Every structure is written in C-alpha cells, then in structure tokens.
Amino acid sequence: MATVIPGPLSLGEDFYREAIEHCRSYNARLCAERSLRLPFLDSQTGVAQNNCYIWMEKTHRGPGLAPGQIYTYPARCWRKKRRLNILEDPRLRPCEYKIDCEAPLKKEGGLPEGPVLEALLCAETGEKKIELKEEETIMDCQKQQLLEFPHDLEVEDLEDDIPRRKNRAKGKAYGIGGLRKRQDTASLEDRDKPYVCDICGKRYKNRPGLSYHYTHTHLAEEEGEENAERHALPFHRKNNHKQFYKELAWVPEAQRKHTAKKAPDGTVIPNGYCDFCLGGSKKTGCPEDLISCADCGRSGHPSCLQFTVNMTAAVRTYRWQCIECKSCSLCGTSENDDQLLFCDDCDRGYHMYCLSPPMAEPPEGSWSCHLCLRHLKEKASAYITLT
C-alpha cells in the first residue's frame, strides 16, 4: 500500500511576521529581566543565573596596577558609567583625547602620577553629586527600556531591584502609575492591616499579631517600669458585642491573676485613678466619676470604657465587673468566655447557652438583655437598632 507523504506546511507572510515579532519581544523581555533580577531564575533550565559583567567599553579602561598589566577594568561597570581615565603612558594615550588637566591636578594636592583614577575617587566630597546624577541617568534608561516591552513589571519592583548607594534616600516612583500608587498607599494599608494598636498606632493584618505586639512590647515595658503594681492593658468597648467578646483572646494570662487590695472588712479597695488614661482624661478632658470593678478594684472613666449614657447609669446599680473578671449573670461562672454575650445597655454578661431560648450565634447589631428590655422598653439599644 502506498503511503502519502504530506508536503511541507506553508505559512503565510503575516503569520511569519507575527511569530518573528513575538520571538523578538520574548527575547527582549528575557534579556531585560536577566539584567535587572539578581539572580535570574531561568524557567527553561531551572538554574539561577547572575549577570556575567564581561562586556566592557574602551572608556572603561584603566591603567595597569600589577607589573606586566596594560589595562585594568572596573568591577560591574554596567551599573555606573566611568569617566575617561587619563593614561600616563604616551603609547597608550588615545590620539583623539587631548586633556591638559594633569598640571593643575599635581599642583592642587600632590596627586600621584600613576593611577589618576584612584586619586579622583579619593575626593568623594566633590564627586558625590556627579555620581548620583549618573546613577539616576542609568535608572532612567533602564526604566525607559522596560516601558518598550509588553510585560507587567511593576515600577516598585524595578526600584527594589536597582541597587542604590548605602546612604541615599529612596527615590521617587517613576512612570504613569507612580503618583496613583503614592496616593493609594494609605488606603491600601488601612484595608490590608485593619487591626491598629491604640497605644503606638502600629497596624497588623490579624488579631494574633496585635496580641503578640501588646504582650511583648507594651506589657514588657510596663512590667519593667512598674514591678510593684501592674496596670491592665487598654481595651476598647464596642457596641458590636460579636467583635467585643473576641477581644478576650489577647488579654494576657498574667494580667488575669491580678490580686486586688482588700479592706479589713473584706471589701475590695478600688483604685483612685483610671487604668486606661492614668488620670489624664484623654477622651473628654473633663473630670468624670470613676467606675470600679467589684472583684479586682480596677477603675476607669466612662469615656475611656466607651460606655453609653444608659450603660453608665446602669453599672452603678449592681456589682459591675471589668472585662477580665466578667462572669455570666445567670450561672455565675466565667468559663467559656468566648460564649459570653454582653448587653449594650448594662454591660452584664450572659452565656449564649444560658439564655432562654439559647443562642447558637451572637446576633447582628446591638443586643439588650431581658432586664434592660423590661426597664428601658423602647429606649433600649435593641429597639433603637431595629428602628
């Protein structure tokens, strides 16, 4: 049986030109990435490669330093263009360059006759500005080269890859998106790091990071300054109790074991200062009556505790407990504190499984207990949220 041999595949001229253009674009992008990334990871071989620095120019030639050397080349010359070296040997001097600056140089500081380049490099004070301008020129050329390639290299990545002088400040972003990125930096940081330290203002991406910061930074400083008595870390009382009971996770165990001072009759002696602002009244700037915990004696201003008007009046009618001593008002235990639900009108705590009927998940918005619903009626936070 005869076998049919297919003829060679004929490609159109347009297809061939497009393939050549794609090949040229890929090679140009590959060379640009190899010169910018240190090292460059070759996707075809999986080998990390570095720039070889073997390509030199005539202007990079310097005088020989060792016996028998005619030329020497500087290291990594592609990062910064060197000025023309003045060769002392007349046989090696280019005929097109006639520089008459040797005599003034010798008169000024008694520079050596041999390698003039080393003497010029010693005068760093007069050449720093020129070198900075040369570096900026190289950076501009490389960035302009990248704009011609159809790829998505970020301008910020380019700035990180191009080396800078050790004591030089970070340059401004170049390109069309540079201004927009600087303007959106604050909003991106607020969105990526929503957890803020209320003492120093440092931001974190998650709550465990903020908890670690509180425990190992501010708590350690406080324990080093005041070994006799320990103050509680500040916490924010929020109307959203679902977020509020999650804050119990970052309270240190050492702070839970705070021993209260008791009077001879057995009653707890409350602190005479606010544990959060230490008496400064930073929230309002006005004097306020302190609210003290019935179990540990810690005190705080209503504004520092972020209490509402109804909550401030309600906590004085019963034995109020701070966040570290809080227990369920129905069963009287502080176990399973992650299940505690706090009333937004009186700050009493209730286990969700102790309520009638029990709750599987905390409700959205404000929540009022049965006592506040009976006493405040339409003025309760739960009714205000619904309306």
Swiss-Prot record:
This is Zinc finger protein neuro-d4. A zinc finger (PHD-type) spans 271-328, 325-375. Keywords: Cytoplasm, Isopeptide bond, Metal-binding, Neurogenesis, Nucleus, Repeat, Transcription, Transcription regulation, Ubl conjugation, Zinc, Zinc-finger. The gene is DPF1. Zn(2+) 4 binds at residues 325, 343, 346, 369, 372. PROSITE patterns: ZF_PHD_1, ZF_PHD_2, ZINC_FINGER_C2H2_1, ZINC_FINGER_C2H2_2. There is a cross-link at residues 106, 129, 133 (Glycyl lysine isopeptide (Lys-Gly) (interchain with G-Cter in SUMO2)). Belongs to the requiem/DPF family. Component of neuron-specific chromatin remodeling complex (nBAF complex) composed of at least, ARID1A/BAF250A or ARID1B/BAF250B, SMARCD1/BAF60A, SMARCD3/BAF60C, SMARCA2/BRM/BAF190B, SMARCA4/BRG1/BAF190A, SMARCB1/BAF47, SMARCC1/BAF155, SMARCE1/BAF57, SMARCC2/BAF170, DPF1/BAF45B, DPF3/BAF45C, ACTL6B/BAF53B and actin. It is found in: Cytoplasm; Nucleus. May have an important role in developing neurons by participating in regulation of cell survival, possibly as a neurospecific transcription factor. Belongs to the neuron-specific chromatin remodeling complex (nBAF complex). During neural development a switch from a stem/progenitor to a postmitotic chromatin remodeling mechanism occurs as neurons exit the cell cycle and become committed to their adult state. The transition from proliferating neural stem/progenitor cells to postmitotic neurons requires a switch in subunit composition of the npBAF and nBAF complexes. A zinc finger (C2H2-type) spans 195-218. It comes from the Eukaryota. Zn(2+) 1 binds at residues 274, 277, 301, 304. Zn(2+) 2 binds at residues 293, 296, 322. Its main location: cytoplasm. GO terms for molecular function: sequence-specific double-stranded DNA binding; zinc ion binding. GO terms for cellular component: chromatin; cytoplasm; nBAF complex; nucleoplasm. GO terms for biological process: apoptotic process; chromatin remodeling; nervous system development; positive regulation of cell differentiation; positive regulation of double-strand break repair; regulation of G0 to G1 transition; regulation of G1/S transition of mitotic cell cycle; regulation of mitotic metaphase/anaphase transition. Zn(2+) 3 binds at residues 328, 331, 351, 354.
